[in-house]
C-alpha cells in the first residue's frame, strides 16, 4: 500500500491518493488507486488510510479463497514506505493528528495486527510497487518499478513450491 500526502495541488486537490497492489506468488492480481475520503493532516494519517484500505481488500480476497477451499497463509505482508505508518499501528495512544476518522482505522489495524493477520514491512520508496498508483511518474521511475516487480516475481517463484526445483 502507499499514499501521497495532499494530492495533486496543480489541480487544486488537497485530498491524498491511496494506491494498493496485491500480489500472489509475485504476480499482481488486484490493484486500485483512489482519492481518500477526506484530507489527511499528515503523511502518517494518509498512510494509515492506505493500509486500512489495503487490509479491507486483502480480507475480502482471503475470505473468498478460504470459502472455495484454497489454503490461506497468515500473516500477509504489507509493504509500507512510511516509518510513521508502521509506528502508529503499534503505538498505544495516537497523537492529535490521528483523531477522528483515523482512530477507527487505526484501532482496526491494531486489532488485525494483534491477531497476526498482517505484518507491516518497511520498504524503500523506490521498491514500493504501489507508489506507481499514487502519482504520475516519470518513465524512468515506471521502468524501475516494473523491473522491481519482475525481480520480486522471480524471487518468489524460486522459493515457491511451484518453481525453483
Regions picked out by a protein language model, each given a short descriptive name:
Residues 1-46:
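RNase H-like nuclease fold core
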Residues 37-165:
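RNase H-like nuclease module associated with reverse transcription
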Amino acid at each position: 500500500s502507499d499514499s501521497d500526502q495532499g494530492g495533486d495541488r496543480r489541480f487544486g486537490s488537497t485530498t491524498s491518493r491511496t494506491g494498493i497492489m496485491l500480489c500472489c506468488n509475485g504476480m499482481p492480481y488486484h490493484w486500485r488507486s483512489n482519492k481518500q475520503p477526506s484530507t489527511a493532516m499528515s503523511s502518517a494519517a494518509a498512510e494509515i488510510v492506505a493500509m486500512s484500505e489495503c487490509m479491507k481488500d486483502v480480507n475480502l480476497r482471503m475470505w473468498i479463497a478460504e470459502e472455495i477451499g484454497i489454503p490461506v497463509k497468515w500473516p500477509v505482508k504489507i509493504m509500507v514506505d512510511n516509518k510513521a505508518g508502521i509506528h502508529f499501528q503499534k503505538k498505544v495512544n495516537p497523537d492529535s493528528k490521528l483523531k477522528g476518522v483515523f482512530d477507527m482505522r487505526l484501532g482496526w489495524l491494531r486489532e488485525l495486527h494483534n491477531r497476526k493477520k498482517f505484518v507491516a514491512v518497511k520498504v524503500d520508496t523506490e521498491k514500493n510497487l504501489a507508489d506507481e498508483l499514487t502519482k504520475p511518474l516519470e518513465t524512468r521511475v515506471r521502468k524501475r518499478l516494473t523491473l522491481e516487480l519482475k525481480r520480486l516475481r522471480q524471487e518468489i517463484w524460486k522459493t515457491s513450491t511451484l518453481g525453483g526445483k
